[in-house]
From Swiss-Prot:
Organism (species): Rattus norvegicus (Rat)
Family annotation (InterPro entries): Nucleoporin, Nup153_N, Retro-transposon_transp_CS, Znf_RanBP2, Znf_RanBP2_sf
Cross-link (Glycyl lysine isopeptide (Lys-Gly) (interchain with G-Cter in SUMO2)): 354
A GO CC term attached to the entry: nuclear membrane
Biased composition (Gly residues): 1-16
Region 29 X 2 AA repeats of F-G, annotated ranges: 237-1411
Protein name: Nuclear pore complex protein Nup153
Gene name of this polypeptide: Nup153
Keyword Secreted included in the entry's annotation: no
Region entry Disordered, spans: 1-39, 78-128, 172-222, 387-429, 693-714, 960-985, 1121-1145, 1190-1209, 1231-1260, 1308-1380, 1414-1468
Known partners and oligomeric status: Part of the nuclear pore complex (NPC). Interacts with TPR (via coiled coil region); the interaction is direct and provides a link between the core structure and the TPR-containing nuclear basket of the nuclear pore complex (NPC). Interacts with HIKESHI. Interacts with SENP2. Interacts with XPO5. Interacts with RAN; the interaction occurs in a GTP- and GDP-independent manner. Interacts with MCM3AP; this interaction is required for MCM3AP localization at the nuclear pore complex. Interacts with MAPK1.
GO function terms (MF aspect): chromatin binding; double-stranded DNA binding; identical protein binding; molecular condensate scaffold activity; nuclear localization sequence binding; protein-membrane adaptor activity; small GTPase binding; structural constituent of nuclear pore
Biased composition, class Basic residues, residue ranges: 1458-1468
Length: 1468
């Protein structure tokens, strides 16, 4: 069947591209006959691959593969292996491609098709249709081995009906599931995709699709045929063998794959794919996007990665990367056999061809990615496949190129190789199917690859061979020859006078032969090859001082001795012109010479060093010999042998001292002769005589000829000139005329100038160098230079070698051994200066100076303290300030105290507007315990770590000072240690991580409106008595962050204590925000905001809003108006005042709100929290994660939000929203996640189990607890609790959101526990407003039911507002997302605040609270100056439940204001 289908594919005009795609299929050597088996359908299918979704293609491939398997029995057994391998590759791909859409179904689906059964089993993914069809379009069709077999399957199925149905299904799946695939991150995330999969499989998707695809493609192919344009079917070129199918799998990625999606980028699902078929039907339509996708052949399974992530990864992999591009570079070395393995990276098995094809299946980049030997030939690199399957196109193109590039022999070789490897004949592109199996099927390249590989192997080697011997043009070194002197360490024997003065134009022949070395008897070492010496002194113009350019000798005139100049030629440099003449480089420019080296036209005589010494060497004039011939020098100075190092025998140093340059005496820089001043230091040039003297070289004369220098050794060149003297101080060699060392200006020895050290006038060098530079030092060896001078002595102290004339060691000034007197016969006695030898005395310790015993710093004699550490001078009585305890009654000294400051003195410090950041007493920064005796420093802006009234304390803070609270002082303290600062009851909110007992005594008169926020991590007992003993802070916002225990009994102290903090604050109406992680006992009257992680007991006796964030146990006896307590420990809040106190406690929190003030008390307790809000006007939302008994007895309109994570007992009648994760007993509408019994309006959010029944039913305050545990909210006020535990809400309009069993009596609070509010568990709402609950709801309010309640506000929490909020059912007048009584105050508070941002803004105060916060106008007004951004209590709250209204029910309870109605709701 497959064979039957073959023709169409070949015929398709667009088939070319498709054919290339088909080529991608892996090529198997034994599959040569395979293409014959490929049917027209197969070809069509392969052509259609572009159009058909990858997953469908997989079906086809499987079918074809199955068919092919059946067709070729021999291949069938291999099929499993191949398929296995391919499947691994393919499955990985599919897994990536499928984006997790692949389902177990594939196996079953595979079985659906008998032919594809084996294939399916092998390729379960193939059958699986990924929801993202695009991604799979490419992969599946090409990838599935059945792809090639598919034609038969396709033929079996009518193209029309099945194709259409399949198409439709694909459209649905593709459009939907492509989207799904895009949108969803998991495999078959969309039902449609699964459905489609099932449908497609059941429908025999491969057949259907192949026919459908065949229709469009056959048309296109036929069109191509009709147009007689060469069309190529991948199948035509490749066999339908499974290996080909496998390669097709890989090819699929190449099919018009989007860099971002595994499949074709046709957007619009299957419909788009169909359109693509038509569009692609155009034979030569080149897909616009030919992306080089670097996709791994073996796509690793992406475990849990979502389909989207996988798509992204796949797209990235497919992207062309530098590495992939580099890999694309063909490696001619590797053989075609190796290439497939290398390329595909698949197991090196018999199926290398297949693997290769698989490799090719990937986008060209990917194929290229795998380092493929010759097979990836430049063709691949060069050609980009216009077709959707880039690889196939590339391969075809490559084949063409190969054909073009390769000779017939190469073709034959390549064919043989290919045939051996893949068993394919070299296909003609014009012939669609002639080439046979693998080349076409193999991803458009099995065969082609082989071909290319072979091709390249054949062709490239020759090319490489040609390239092997590149003809490199001689490029002169950019470096001037002068900079690259040649060092000849064997001195050639040079005959002097051999250099006849030849016109400079005559080049010196390069034939210069190395004359016998050592003929002159000179040492073997030669610095530069001897330049031909012009022994004629006449040649030397008088102007050339010490430097002569030898006239270049005509090569005819070159004598043997001159031949030595050859050596010189390379190093010869045009010194004057700074032109380096390289004989080799100049040979071309010089007159033709048979010699290998053409001599420079102008030869400069002299050593390289001479030239190096010349300023030209340092100047850019120096040109490389190649760049500038020596002709540049207009004047040729023939310097006698002076410039010839070894041959001339001139000293090495003298050559440097050539007359062409002069050395600056000051900076020793070589300057040009023409320079009158040193170019560096601008020192004037010395007269010629002086120069000669300094250089030790006279103007070169005939006598300068190195006749006598032949015996000098190499070392002689380095010997100092006669008269030079070495500075004893810096050892710099100075010229004879210098009276001072040029470096250190030390007087020359014997000049009569006083020197620190006696210096010898004698020169080190025994050699006397005459100005003629002729060194007479015979044959001194090089090592002689390093021999110790006669008479030199070694200092026994420092082992420094000293000269014989030195009476003292030049280093340590030690006396010369055996010398009694400091002076010697040849040394000048010198009186050392007071500074000691060399001024070393300066380093001596001044007389009387003393070293600090502490820091070892040397101090002056008159210093009584160390200048560094101020330590007292030894023997002097100095006051040492240690880190011990310092008790300073005056806070003026700023001490940083880490200890427990026991400030027991009546420190009535009125830090009225002191913007002090104090960690302890103002006095100082003390590390130890400090007792602060009250000093009143108003406006004292010091950075003090001792305790101020608002303390951040990490230790136990016993604040037992009565403090005079001045309402204008604002004390923010940050204490790390316990600070016994009596913080005013005014706003004392400790942030305590320990147990925090906030027993704010009701000294309201003293703390009118001071809000203290304490953050204590220890148990803090804040009992600020109104007496301003310690710190008088009145109406000051005091935020304390206490990590220890805090006993704050003075002005509102916000301790941050890590230890137990006892903050007793007597100020009422002060906002106390305490965040305590320990036990915090805060009795401050000011509204404390306690965040207690431990047990929190809050007893607020005043309507102060106390916001406590308590992480420890916190006993708040006083609850300011705004007291949010966030307690992570046991939190006991006794709210005596109508202050809303939000408590967030992670421990047991017992907020006892005793005061029926208008306090919104939000308790957020993570531990057991007892919120007893006696204030009736305080709405207390408790958010407790542990047992939370929130009983707010105060029924005023104060919204006490107790957010308790511990047990929160909020009994405040004001709206208290308790968010209880444990059991929350929230009589108030409390949101308790635990059992929250909130009798007050406080809304505790209790996460732990809180079995504390609501103490007292609060009045019309709406406290919606959010209870996740059992929540019993018996609050008459609207209590909207979100409780996950059982919540008994007996609040009037408390709506609980209870996940557990909740009894919500009056308040309709959504409770996740049992709660009157809408609960997800059983909820018994005793209060008339029954919040919709997800559990059983015993509430008069209909939950989710269309009842007729007068006012159902659309509230997510309970809304106690006189207005009827619009509900999802009936909306009377109030439209709020939470139950909110909009008071006049407009505050966007998440805690309690008079002004609330309510969506149901009926009361003046509108609060947007996430806890239940029925905003009672009075309650809203009550919060003391708390216009804060509170997350807890608030009169108006955004509550999940509605005040006695069913949020989700059409029936609305017309609850106006505090009107409590029992919603009739279903009860479970």
């Amino acid at each position: 069947m497959a064979s039957g289908a073959g023709g169409i594919g070949g015929g398709g005009g667009g088939g070319k591209i498709r054919t290339r795609r088909c080529h991608q299929g892996p090529v198997k050597p034994y599959q040569q006959g395979r293409p014959q088996h490929q049917g027209i359908l197969s070809r069509v299918t392969e052509s259609v691959k572009n159009i058909v979704p990858g997953w469908l293609q997989r079906y086809f491939n499987k079918s074809e593969n199955a068919c092919s398997c059946s067709v070729n029995a021999d291949e069938v057994p291999r099929w499993p292996e191949n398929r296995e391998d391919e499947r691994e590759i393919y499955v990985d791909e599919n897994t990536n491609t499928d984006d997790g859409r692949t389902t177990p179904e594939p196996t079953g689906s595979n079985t659906e098709e008998p032919s594809t059964t084996s294939t399916a089993s092998n390729y379960p993914d193939v059958l699986t249709r990924p929801s993202l069809h695009r991604s799979h379009l490419n992969f599946s069709v090409l990838e599935s081995p059945a792809l090639h077999c598919q034609p038969s399957t396709s033929s079996a199925f009518p193209i029309g009906s099945s194709g259409f149905s399949l198409v439709k299904e694909i459209k649905d799946s593709t459009s939907q599931h492509d989207d799904d695939n895009i949108s969803t991150t998991s495999g078959f995330s969309s039902r449609a995709s699964e459905k489609d999969i099932a449908v497609s499989k059941n429908t025999s998707l491969p057949p259907l699709w192949s026919p459908e695809a065949e229709r469009s493609h056959s048309l296109s192919q036929h069109t191509a045929i009709s147009s007689k344009k060469p069309a190529f079917n991948l199948s035509a070129f490749g066999t339908l063998s499974t290996s080909l199918g496998n390669s097709s799998i890989l090819k699929t990625s190449q099919l018009g794959d989007s860099p971002f999606y595994p499949g074709k980028t046709t957007y619009g699902g299957a419909a788009a794919a169909v359109r693509q078929n038509k569009v692609r039907s155009t034979p030569y339509q080149a897909p616009v996007r030919r992306q080089m996708k670097a996709k791994q052949l073996n796509a690793q399974s992406y475990g849990v990665t979502s389909s989207t992530a996988r798509r992204i990864l796949q797209s990235l992999e497919k992207m062309s990367s530098p590495l992939a591009d580099a890999k694309r570079i063909p490696s001619a070395v590797s053989s075609p056999l190796n290439s497939p393995l290398d390329r595909s990276g698949i197991d090196s098995t018999v199926f290398q061809a297949k693997k290769e094809k698989v490799d090719s299946q990937y986008p060209p980049v990917q194929r290229l990615m795998t380092p493929k030997p010759v097979s990836i030939a430049t063709n691949r690199t060069v050609y980009f496949k216009p077709s959707l399957t880039p690889s196939g196109d590339l391969r075809k193109t490559n084949q063409r190129i190969d054909k073009k590039n390769s000779t017939v022999d190469e073709k034959n070789i390549s064919r043989q190789n290919r045939e051996q490897e893949s068993g394919f004949s070299y296909p003609n592109f014009s012939i669609p199917a002639a080439n046979g199996l693998s080349s076409g099927v193999g991803g458009g390249g099995g065969k082609m690859r082989r071909e290319r590989t072979t091709h390249f192997v054949a062709s490239k080697p020759s090319e490489e061979e040609e390239v092997e011997v590149p003809l490199l043009p001689q490029i002169s070194l950019p470096i001037s020859s002068s900079s690259l002197p040649t060092f000849n360490f064997s001195s050639p024997a040079i005959s002097a006078a051999s250099s006849s003065s030849v016109s400079p134009s005559q080049p010196l022949s390069n034939k210069v032969q190395m004359t016998s070395l050592g003929s002159t008897g000179n040492p073997v070492f030669t610095f530069s090859s001897p330049i031909v010496k012009s022994t004629q002194a006449d040649v030397l113009p008088p102007a050339s001082i010490g430097f002569t350019f030898s006239v270049p000798l005509a090569k005819t005139e070159l004598s043997g001795p001159n031949s030595s100049s050859e050596t010189v030629l390379s190093s010869s440099v045009t010194a004057q012109d700074n032109t380096v003449v390289n004989s080799s480089s100049s040979k071309k420019r010089s007159a033709p010479c048979e010699d290998p080296f053409t001599p420079a036209k102008i030869l400069r005589e002299g050593s390289v060093l001479d030239i190096l010494k010349t300023p030209g060497f340092m100047s850019p004039k120096v040109d490389s010999p190649a760049l500038q011939p020596t002709t540049t020098s207009s004047i040729v100075y023939t310097r006698p042998a002076i410039s010839t190092f070894s041959s001339s025998g001139v000293e090495f140093g003298e050559s440097l001292k050539a007359g062409s340059s002069w050395q600056c005496d000051t900076c020793l820089l070589q300057n040009k002769v023409t320079d009158n001043k040193c170019i560096a230091c601008q020192a004037a040039k010395l007269p010629l005589k002086e120069t000669a003297k300094q250089t030790g070289i006279g103007t070169p004369s005939k006598s300068d000829k190195p006749a006598s220098t032949s015996g000098t050794g190499f070392g002689d060149k380095f010997k100092p000139a006669i008269g030079t003297w070495d500075c004893d101080t810096c050892l710099v060699q100075n010229k004879p005329e210098a009276v001072k060392c040029v470096a250190c200006e030390t007087p020359k020895p014997g000049t009569g100038v006083k020197r620190a050290l006696p210096l010898t006038v004698a020169s080190e060098s025994p050699v006397t160098a005459s100005s003629s530079t002729t060194v007479t030092t015979g044959t001194l060896g090089f090592g002689d230079k390093f021999k110790r001078p006669v008479g030199s002595w070694e200092c026994p102290v420092c082992c420094v070698s000293n000269k014989a004339e030195d009476s003292r060691c030049v280093s340590c000034t030690s006396e010369k051994p055996g010398l009694v007197s400091a002076s010697s016969s040849n040394s000048v006695p010198v009186s050392l200066p007071s500074g000691g030898c060399l001024g070393l005395d300066k380093f001596k310790k001044p007389e009387g100076s003393w070293d600090c015993e502490v820091c070892l710093v040397q101090n002056k004699a008159d210093s009584t303290k160390c200048i560094a550490c101020e330590s007292a001078k030894p023997g002097t009585k100095s006051e040492f300030k240690g880190f011990g305890t310092s008790s300073s009654l005056n806070p003026a000294p700023s001490a940083f105290k880490f200890g427990i400051p026991s400030s027991s003195s009546g420190l009535s410090q009125t830090f009225t507007s002191t913007g002090n950041f104090k960690f302890g007493d103002q006095g100082g920064f003390k590390l130890g315990t400090s007792s602060d005796s009250g000093s009143t420093n108003t406006m004292n802006t010091n950075f003090k770590f001792p305790k101020p009234t608002g303390d951040f304390k990490f230790g136990v803070l016993p604040d037992s000072k009565p403090e005079e609270i001045k309402n204008d002082s604002k004390n923010d303290n940050f204490q790390f240690g316990p600070s016994s600062g009596l913080s005013n009851p005014a706003s004392s909110a400790p942030f305590q991580f320990g147990v925090s007992t906030l027993g704010q005594q009701e000294k309201k008169e003293e703390l009118p409106q001071s809000s203290s926020a304490g953050f204590s991590f220890g148990a803090g007992v804040a009992n600020p008595s109104s007496a301003a003993i310690d710190t008088t802070v009145t109406s000051e916002n005091k935020s304390g962050f206490n990590f220890g225990t805090i006993d704050t009994k003075s002005v509102s102290v916000t301790p941050f204590t890590y230890k137990t903090t006892e903050a007793k604050k007597e100020d009422a109406s002060a906002t106390k925000g305490g965040f305590t992680f320990g036990k915090v006992d805060s009795a401050a009257l000011s509204s404390p905001s306690m965040f207690v992680l431990g047990r929190t007991e809050e007893k607020q006796q005043e309507p102060v809003t106390s916001t406590s964030l308590v992480f420890g146990k916190k006993a708040d006896n006083e609850e300011p108006k705004c007291q949010p307590v966030f307690s992570f420990g046991n939190s006991e809040q006794t709210k005596d005042e109508s202050s809303s106190k939000p408590t967030f406690s992670f421990s047991v929190a017992k907020p006892s709100v005793k005061e029926s003030d208008q306090l919104a008390k939000a308790t957020f307790a993570f531990g057991n929290q007892t919120n007893t809000t006696t204030d009736q006007g305080a709405a207390k939302p408790a958010f407790s994660f542990l047992n939370s008994s929130s009983s707010s007895s105060s029924t005023p309109a104060t919204s006490s939000s107790a957010s308790i994570f511990g047990s929160s007992t909020s009994s405040s009648s004001p709206p208290v929203a308790a968010f209880v994760f444990g059991q929350a007993s929230n009589p108030v509408s409390s949101s308790a996640f635990g059992n929250s019994a909130e009798s007050s309006t406080s809304q505790p959010l209790l996460f732990p189990q809180d079995g504390k029944p609501a103490t007292t039913s609060s009045t019309a305050s709406a406290a919606p607890p959010f209870v996740f545990g059992t929540g019993a909210s018996s609050n008459s006020t609207v209590s909207s609790g979100f409780t996950f535990g059982a919540t008994t809400t007996s609040s009037s309009s408390g709506s609980f959101f209870v996940f557990g069993t909740g009894h919500s009596a009056p308040s309709a609070s959504p409770a996740f526990g049992a709660n009157q509010t809408p609960t997800f568990g059983q909820s018994q709402g005793a209060s008339q407003p029954n919040p919709p609950s997800f559990g059983s709801i015993s509430s008069s309010t209909a939950l989710f039911s269309a009842g007729s309640q007068p006012v159902p506000p659309p509230t997510f929490g309970t809304v106690s507002s006189s207005s009827q909020p619009p509900v999802f059912g009936q909306q009377p007048s109030q439209s709020a997302f939470g139950s909110g009584t909009a008071n006049a105050s407009s505050v966007f508070q998440f805690g309690s605040s008079t002004t609330n941002f309510n969506f149901t803004n009926n009361n003046p105060s509108g609060v947007f609270t996430f806890g239940a916060s029925p905003s009672t106008p009075a309650a809203a007004a009550q919060p003391s100056g708390s216009g804060g951004f509170s997350f807890s209590q608030s009169p108006a709250s955004f509550t999940v439940g509605s005040n006695g209204k069913n949020m989700f029910s059409s029936s609305g309870t017309s609850v106006s204001g505090r009107k409590i109605k029992t919603a009739v709701r279903r009860k479970k």
